[in-house]
Amino acid sequence: MANVAVYNMEGKEVDKIELNDSIFGVEINEHLVHMAVLQQLANKRQGTQKAKTRSEVRGGGRKPWRQKGTGHARQGSTRSPQWTGGGVVFAPTPRDYSFKLNKKEKRAALKSALTSRVVENKFVVVDELKLDEIKTKKFVEVLKNLNVEKALVVLNDMDEKVIASAANIPTVKTTQTNELNVFDVLKYDTVVVTKAAVATIEEVYA
């Protein structure tokens, strides 16, 4: 099992904990991680794009001029794609881009993502994250003490003061253990997680 330091909000090491290898020490499956990220991005797509083909554009039923003798190139309709106001070739239509990964694959992908952060020393454990008031400046100070900037902050419980304090920091996202996902883990440079959240993750995914 990997030993990692536990820091307080001042950035001082106060403890060490062992991480469960079945979650934080697995063999990294890059293909599954890739598929999990693709799934999240695909499921976000609206898929509402639409353009009209030549058969859907209004008008253009009459041949604009006779086939021969005008000196013009032959044309069958003013709604052909080469005409202004004509239809679109292979026009996009609404579609559903989403696809599914089974539960086992999702869990394996998340474990791989978490393991990669531990291996890269981008997994920071804090004993707790508590603020007396909603104060962005104070939260920035905590991050500075921990030597992190672009971070995913994983909380065990909904802490409104911490969440509100981090809301205006564009390089930080707060989440809870039940909302943890591969995309967020990889998007942010560092995962900052409370000691209680680590225990919950190990309880759920072990």
Swiss-Prot record:
SUPFAM superfamilies: Ribosomal protein L4. One of its GO terms (molecular function) is structural constituent of ribosome. Keywords: Ribonucleoprotein, Ribosomal protein, RNA-binding, rRNA-binding. GO terms for biological process: translation. Residues 44-87 are annotated as: Disordered. Pfam families: Ribosomal_L4. The keyword Disulfide bond does not apply. Gene3D superfamilies: 3.40.1370.10. GO terms for cellular component: ribonucleoprotein complex; ribosome. Part of the 50S ribosomal subunit. PANTHER family: 50S RIBOSOMAL PROTEIN L4 (PTHR10746), LARGE RIBOSOMAL SUBUNIT PROTEIN UL4M (PTHR10746:SF6). One of the primary rRNA binding proteins, this protein initially binds near the 5'-end of the 23S rRNA. It is important during the early stages of 50S assembly. It makes multiple contacts with different domains of the 23S rRNA in the assembled 50S subunit and ribosome. This is Large ribosomal subunit protein uL4. It comes from Agathobacter rectalis (strain ATCC 33656 / DSM 3377 / JCM 17463 / KCTC 5835 / VPI 0990) (Eubacterium rectale). The lineage of its organism: Bacteria, Bacillati, Bacillota, Clostridia, Lachnospirales.
